[in-house]
Amino acid sequence: MVGWRISSRKSPAPQKVTTGRFEVERDGQVAYLEYTLTGSVLGLLHTEVPEKLRGLRLASTLAETGLQYALKNKLKVDVICPSVLDYLAKHPEYSHLVLR
């Protein structure tokens, strides 16, 4: 997948909350999933995919990236983003990560 990049940018915020985004870049445009990290909870907030990049399953790629990050770092997830909720409905193997 030449031209693709997944990264996380972090910026500190008050009360030990880290905010950032998981990103995928293609053809000079960036799709992203915004998150917060508070203690051991990863909040998956909002996915944005530029119109030109829609239909390439980037929202699914970003959802999987966020969930894999939570899994590897032993975090729970608080899912607000509808795209991530849709992904979870199709991938129940991640359901144990979701805050109840």
Predicted feature locations:
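C-terminal structural segments of small proteins and small subunits
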Residues: Q68-R100
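Short, hydrophobic/aliphatic alpha-helical segments
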Residues: L45, E64-T65, Y69
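N-terminal first-folded block
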Residues: V2-L42
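A short, internal acetyl-CoA/4′-phosphopantetheine-binding micro-motif in the GNAT/acyltransferase core
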Residues: T47-R54
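Conserved acetyl-CoA-binding loop-helix of GNAT-fold acetyltransferases
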Residues: G55-G66
